[in-house]
């Protein structure tokens, strides 16, 4: 049976890729053979993640971005297409750690701050 989740040689963009969630996803997908593109505001951290992936034999690149700036995102898209020729997947991990938009182990989804959750949701959709 074919592997239904094969990401080998797929170009995967991760917004917020320098964050905790984005970094974890990037590392795993790189181990599975994906070509990782980290988009984030934190250049130093993003470049370190790329270096870590490359040190393990993976392929990755970093592009400085701001997910709230459409012009920068359009330029990111052009640069990524120029480098890789295609985009196979986009994972939006930006904004996920905003205070109030997450809950602890002793809370339920009903304890979420709805305004903070909406802000994170809007960032992810942009």
Q: What is each PLM-predicted segment?
A:
Residues 3-37:
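Canonical Rossmann dinucleotide-binding motif of NAD(H)/NADP(H)-dependent dehydrogenases/reductases
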Residues 7, 56-59, 79-92, 98, ...:
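A glycine-rich helix->loop->beta "capping" turn
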Residues 14-27, 45, 62-68, 86, ...:
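A structural preference for long, well-packed, hydrophobic secondary-structure segments
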Residues 32-49:
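Conserved glycine-rich Rossmann-like NAD(P)H-binding loop of the short-chain dehydrogenase/reductase
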Residues 43-44, 63-77, 114:
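The beta1-alpha1 cofactor-binding region of Rossmann-like NAD(H)/NADP(H)-dependent oxidoreductases
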Residues 49-57:
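Short, conserved SAM-binding/catalytic segment
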Residues 101-118:
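Substrate-binding pocket helix/loop in short-chain dehydrogenase/reductase
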Residues 125-126:
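Conserved small/polar residues in nucleotide/adenosyl-binding loops
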């Amino acid at each position: 049976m074919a592997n239904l989740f094969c990401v080998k040689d797929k170009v995967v963009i991760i917004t917020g890729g320098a964050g905790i969630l984005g970094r974890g996803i990037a590392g795993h997908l790189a181990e599975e053979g994906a070509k990782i593109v980290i988009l984030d505001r934190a250049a130093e951290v993003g470049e370190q993640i790329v270096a870590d992936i490359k040190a393990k034999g993976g392929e990755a690149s970093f592009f400085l971005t701001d997910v709230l700036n459409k012009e920068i995102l359009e330029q990111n898209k052009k640069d990524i297409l120029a480098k890789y020729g295609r985009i196979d997947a986009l994972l939006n991990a930006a904004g996920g750690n905003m205070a109030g938009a997450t809950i602890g182990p002793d809370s339920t989804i009903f304890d979420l701050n709805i305004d903070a959750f909406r802000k994170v949701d809007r960032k992810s959709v942009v």
